[in-house]
Amino acid sequence: MALARAVVRIESNWKTHLTGRAGEVGLMQIKHQTARGQGYGGSRAALYDPETNIKWGMRYLAGAYRLAGGDTCGTVMRYQGGHGARRMSATARAYCSKARTLMASN
């Protein structure tokens, strides 16, 4: 749960109607295409609903967690860069550092 809260804080700072530069939406900044890949059948606009956004964002985060074998940095690397991400970029390292800091403060 601490990791999920950290991801929401990093991605949107709890702003439900935020839109990212690459089309990410809502609290967890999930892309419509990504949610559809997880089985979502609704509209892009519906992903702004906090409950919907968290449901599908958490599904994606859980997949990243499984692929990373539970490793925090591997999880956020795959959440941010896609489930197929294999290399820890400088951006992913910074994201991991932020997530760890936020998790420690909860």
Residue positions per predicted region:
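Catalytic glycan-binding domains that act on GlcNAc-containing polysaccharides
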Residues: 1-106
